[in-house]
């Protein structure tokens, strides 16, 4: 028997459903990592979707070993540049920034985003970070990296997106040595993630503005005699007399979309350097041509085309093992209709 009581279909865990503060997503936690020092994550711009024909390598699957069609999302991932290194300490009140070191060799477009340091002594700042590590004050190190959308033809903007990405692996001394090595240099997705790995993708979803309770919460349209009151796409009532106010759990109209969402355990099917091999005839709708490095992610990714997408190693990977998928075909059929 179906469930009779169905006040809403949406989760209250995301309330209040308001617009994201920034189109650049933020991570509050990172997965454990025990390998060599590396930057945990990367960022790119969503291009669109296509499909591939690959061999099903999922054990115990009814189609194991057979060719299956899989939808994929294309994310263009040009090299990012490390602008600085930030050291965090931790006390009873939580994490807080201690000190940081910036490079002076920055792209001119970054000045559109922040006030870039002009008379910054990079060597002295790095020594201050190393001293804080030696004194045991530092708990974590983060790389301050920014994207380079000015190198993309499909993203019509010049302003880079700046973000923090944790440096993990080895001891703190190894991490600060690695941070000093990559400071001011480019990093690529191939150095951080590998084909077949499971990742988490985070982006700000497509904004839909103000929507009613039927679309926003999935409540039913009024039926039969209930619709004779003149309104159909509304809720039955706003709640009891007492408490003498409208509770926040009541499904009402309001902002829908443009909220940060994370989807877990997405598999990387391919990392490529030449976007021409996956660009359909006429280009991707609402994006255009992919000319540089790209990544194919199984399934969908939040947000519209051209939206910034952050990628990190899966934090809830479970028993998934890294297996290189066998892709036999990538659809480049025109999407123009």
Swiss-Prot record:
Part of the 50S ribosomal subunit. Forms a cluster with proteins L14 and L24e. This is Large ribosomal subunit protein uL3. PANTHER family: 60S RIBOSOMAL PROTEIN L3-RELATED, LARGE RIBOSOMAL SUBUNIT PROTEIN UL3. Residues 1-28 are annotated as: Disordered. One of the primary rRNA binding proteins, it binds directly near the 3'-end of the 23S rRNA, where it nucleates assembly of the 50S subunit. GO terms for cellular component: cytosolic large ribosomal subunit. GO terms for biological process: translation. Belongs to the universal ribosomal protein uL3 family.
């Amino acid at each position: 028997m179906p469930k009779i009581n169905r006040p809403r279909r949406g989760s209250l865990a995301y309330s209040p459903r308001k617009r994201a503060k920034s189109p650049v997503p933020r991570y509050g936690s990172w997965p454990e990592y025990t390998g060599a020092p590396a930057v945990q994550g990367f960022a790119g711009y969503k291009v669109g979707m296509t499909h591939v024909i690959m061999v099903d390598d999922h054990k115990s699957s009814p189609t194991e070993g057979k060719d299956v069609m899989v939808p994929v999302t294309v994310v263009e991932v040009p090299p990012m540049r490390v602008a600085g290194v930030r050291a965090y300490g931790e006390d009873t009140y939580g994490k807080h920034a201690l000190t940081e070191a910036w490079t002076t060799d920055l792209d001119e477009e970054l000045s559109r985003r922040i006030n870039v340091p002009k008379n910054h002594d990079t060597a002295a700042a790095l020594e201050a970070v190393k001293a804080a590590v030696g004194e045991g004050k530092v708990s974590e190190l983060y790389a301050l990296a920014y994207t380079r959308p000015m190198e993309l033809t499909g993203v019509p903007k010049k302003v880079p997106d700046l973000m923090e990405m944790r440096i993990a692996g080895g001891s703190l001394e190894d991490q600060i040595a690695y941070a000093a090595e990559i400071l001011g240099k480019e990093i690529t997705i191939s150095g951080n993630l590998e084909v077949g790995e499971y990742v988490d993708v985070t982006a700000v979803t497509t904004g839909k503005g103000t929507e009613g309770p039927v679309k926003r919460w999935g409540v039913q349209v009024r039926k039969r005699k209930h619709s004779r009151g003149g309104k159909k796409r509304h809720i039955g009532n706003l709640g009891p007399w007492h408490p003498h106010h409208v509770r926040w759990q009541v499904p009402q109209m309001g902002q829908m979309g443009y909220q940060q969402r994370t989807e877990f355990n997405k598999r990387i099917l391919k990392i490529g350097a030449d976007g021409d091999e996956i660009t359909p005839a006429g280009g991707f709708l609402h994006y255009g041509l992919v000319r540089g490095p790209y990544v194919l992610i199984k399934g969908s990714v939040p947000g519209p085309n051209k939206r910034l997408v952050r990628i990190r190693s899966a934090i809830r990977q479970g028993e998934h093992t890294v297996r290189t998928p066998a892709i036999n075909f990538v659809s480049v059929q025109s999407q123009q209709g």
